[in-house]
Amino acid sequence: MARVTIEDCLDNVDNRFELVLVASKRARQLAKGIAEPLVDVDNDKPTVLALREIAAGKITRDILNQPEHNFATSSLDLALSGDHSF
């Protein structure tokens, strides 16, 4: 897959600061398995997938209005949350 540029993403998001917020929230969803990728994975990491989804117009700033899912997905997450039942 060709590289994703900031300019490709800015066609679908208002500014670069909002792009950081949208991409980071989406990458977190993908990394935790909360959401399925909307583009071909092509062995990309969650951050690249998030940017590719934004550039393709599949993810918009509306993601910022979605509630956070508080799923602990690793023993580190559980340890940091204070849940020691693992």
From Swiss-Prot:
GO terms for cellular component: DNA-directed RNA polymerase complex. Keywords: DNA-directed RNA polymerase, Nucleotidyltransferase, Transcription, Transferase. Signal peptide: none annotated. Its EC number is 2.7.7.6. It holds the Pfam family RNA_pol_Rpb6. GO terms for biological process: DNA-templated transcription. It comes from the Bacteria. SUPFAM superfamilies: RPB6/omega subunit-like. Promotes RNA polymerase assembly. Latches the N- and C-terminal regions of the beta' subunit thereby facilitating its interaction with the beta and alpha subunits. The RNAP catalytic core consists of 2 alpha, 1 beta, 1 beta' and 1 omega subunit. When a sigma factor is associated with the core the holoenzyme is formed, which can initiate transcription. This is DNA-directed RNA polymerase subunit omega.
